[in-house]
Amino acid sequence: MASNPTTARVCFATLLTTDSYVPGALTLAASLRATGTSHEIICLVADGQLSRSALERLELTFDRIVCVPILQSADTANLALLGRPDLGSTVTKIGIWNLTEYARIAFLDADTLVLGSIDSLLDMSNNDMAIGHDIRPNGGMENAGLLAAAPDLGWPDMFNS
């Protein structure tokens, strides 16, 4: 059954895998609230990876904290090429696909600063997807630092066929 986009539960979400991004995540939440959004703002946290004090600060700012299992990329060669071995845990953001209680989620990296309303990302139909486009000197590539889509546990199966 299709959900009604005007009444369905939707949210903005971010992910933290270390304490070092807590200031950015707090800034992201504050910048979203400054736009006047009425939508839920949630924070996914890698299970067992953040300090108690970091979690307490997040609980005061976000509407909901969701613990997700940490995932690590086994692609050490490409992480080394990027010079960013710390990005290995960014695949943990795939945990948003499990949040099927939401009809739509707009995922934003924790170091994002929102300067104006982006509520329209949550108003799109469930058949639409928005991905931030990142321009690089070697050509364009998609940046999953901004992703708006409808969670669906069956979605990853597309890649297995």
Label each PLM-derived region with a short phrase.
Residues 1-161:
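Glycosyltransferase catalytic domains, chiefly GT-A lineage
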